[in-house]
Amino acid sequence: MIFHQLEHVIGVSWVIQAAIFAALLLFAGGLLVRARVAGPRGGLLPDEGVSVRNVLEVLVAWLAGMARDRMGPNWRRYFPVVGTVFFFVLFANLIGLVPGFEGATGDINTTAALAIVVWVFYTAIGIIEHGSQYILKFMGPPLGKSHVHWLAPFFLILEIPLDLSRIMTLAVRLLANMFADHTVVAVWMTLIPIGVPAIFMGLGLIVAFLQAFVFALLTMIYIGLALEEPH
């Protein structure tokens, strides 16, 4: 693997290299679209045929539609983070399908870091939007309106671990699926290097997209829940 070989040369972990490479691809794609939009036609007309810009615009429009439905009227404020997460995960997944490369999402450090970022982000949104009410919701029904307020400590003990478990589910789901997918492709490329691996690489493309979609979708759902008024 190229990143593993470079690790011994430059002294930087292959995971960090793969993550930086995915981020650079995302940045390059953004610059390409920006350059096309700033062109003579002002970006009003789509490119002819299939192009990077057209694909990215379709994906962004599709994500925006989902974000509008799941994050409410203020979705535009938080959509850049959701979009960045989606494309970073997608590019990191796709890198793992390229012979000689390994995707950053095949390592728990990357998936756990992404999950923690998502958790911190939607928790901060909840606190900013609702203040102390967001924290109090972990204590069950409103204390002044419930005859079971004495159960509040028990609700707190249950709800906080449940909320933190989202970090583990996000991280492990992405890691398990991408590690298994990349392993299957690598094994078949070793056993039968011609023909058969192409089938699994095609399936790998689908898996890479679906896992990025699921990660982004769950991020939207968690943000939407954080934006809801506490009851």
Label each residue range with its predicted role.
Residues M1-H231:
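Selective transmembrane helix interface/packing segments
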